[in-house]
Regions:
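ATPase catalytic-site recognition across NTP-hydrolyzing enzymes
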Residues: 137-140
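Conserved ATP-binding N-box helix of the HATPase_c
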Residues: 12, 73-106, 162-165, 170
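Amphipathic alpha-helical interaction surfaces in cytosolic regulatory modules
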Residues: 1-43
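Short beta-strand element(s) in the Bergerat
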Residues: 108-112, 205
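Flexible, glycine-/charge-rich segments associated with ATP-binding catalytic modules
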Residues: 1-14, 44, 48-52, 129-133, ...
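Acidic ATP/Mg2+-coordinating residue in the GHKL
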Residues: 116
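A short glycine-centered beta->alpha linker in the GHKL/HATPase_c
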Residues: 120-131, 135
């Protein structure tokens, strides 16, 4: 039975509590590997599928990521859109010093994880004077379009994350896992699961995606607000 992205996060928690007893790094999922490297400072140098996101906005990782995932030609625009949106989110909101992206192909799906060590979603919104109940509430508000982006004196509605989730869960029959601070939110087409992660908080923000890309996905069908 296929492990979900939520199962992968729970596996990370087990590994972390076992003092990083890792035997085969190449078998780690993107969710686990990016967390261990960026969140916990573990060196996993033999992972060829991981790429750095540099604060200076170097974008060479994108082509390398896409090439390694072997995305079908008719769905390359899906991955291009998602990578562009999530990369921009990191640059515009996180104030990060270290970021990573990792993709991995499985027989029936593709997994991609983005992580940064920035200020996390709740702190980003608090810095903009938004009222936040907790870290899960902050994640949901960000998904629903609450944004800290301000240009020419106007606060913009943030649609990139919302569109990305809509494409993944409805267009690609996939799922999304977002961990930020002490909040964890797992989304599928039919369900939203949330929990507080006091013992294993994410120092910045993790966004993991699982996508089924065997059939062509028309991203323009999903560029509409997805209200959670």
């Amino acid at each position: 039975m296929e492990k979900t992205l939520l199962n992968e996060f729970e596996k990370y928690e087990e590994i972390r509590n076992d003092e990083f007893e890792i035997i085969d790094c190449e078998n780690l999922s993107p969710t686990i590997a990016t967390l261990l490297i960026c969140n916990d400072g573990l060196r996993l140098d033999n992972l060829k599928t991981i790429r750095k996101i540099e604060p200076e906005k170097v974008t060479t990782f994108e082509n390398e990521l896409l090439h390694g995932l072997e995305i079908p030609k008719n769905n390359k625009n899906v991955i291009n859109f998602i990578v562009h949106e999530l990369r921009n989110n990191i640059y515009e909101h996180s104030q990060f010093k270290r970021g990573l992206v990792m993709g991995k192909s499985y027989p029936d799906f593709k997994d991609i994880s983005f992580i940064d060590n920035g200020i996390n979603i709740a702190n980003s919104l608090k810095n903009a004077n938004y009222a936040i109940k907790n870290d899960c509430d902050a994640i949901l508000k960000a998904i629903n379009g609450l944004s800290t982006k301000n240009e020419l004196g106007f606060v913009e509605r943030g649609t990139g994350l919302n569109n990305t989730i809509n494409i993944v869960v409805n267009g690609c029959y996939g799922s999304v896992l977002i961990g930020s601070g002490k909040g964890l939110v797992f989304l599928t087409k039919d369900n939203i699961y949330m929990k507080t992660i006091d013992e294993t908080p994410v120092n910045g923000t993790l966004i993991s995606l699982r996508m089924h890309l065997s059939e062509k996905v028309d991203i323009y069908k999903y560029l509409n607000p997805l209200k959670l």
